[in-house]
Swiss-Prot record:
Keyword Secreted: no
Name recorded for this polypeptide: Protein M2-2
Keywords: Host cytoplasm, Viral RNA replication
Family listed: Belongs to the orthopneumovirus M2-2 protein family.
Gene field: M2-2
UniProt source species: Human respiratory syncytial virus B (strain B1)
Pfam family, one: Pneumo_M2
Source organism, top-level taxon: Viruses
């Protein structure tokens, strides 16, 4: 199993996530605050705070940001071994 290629653009800290773009050979998916609110409305569960918070929180270090992104992928059952992940921050 290979680790996903993760790029943070621009590379600055502290930051908050503006959007996440996930790509593979067969698909591209983007997530932002509006997408997540719609996802939560359609899939109400105990973990919806995690999805909202990833875009609301300030991430102080690259490790915090990568940990939050990996939790996000796990929550959505996205296999992280075949993807390139672009994290756009502000």
């Amino acid at each position: 199993m290979t680790k996903p290629k993760i790029m943070i653009l621009p590379d600055k800290y502290p930051c908050s996530i503006s959007s996440i773009l996930i790509s593979s050979e067969s698909m591209i998916a983007t997530f932002n605050h509006k997408n997540i609110l719609q996802f939560n409305h359609n899939h109400l569960d105990n973990h919806q705070r995690l999805l909202n918070n990833i875009f609301d929180e300030i991430h102080w270090t690259p490790k915090n940001l990568l940990d939050a992104t990996q939790q996000f992928l796990q929550h959505l059952n996205i296999p992280e071994d075949i993807y390139t992940i672009y994290i756009l921050v502000s």
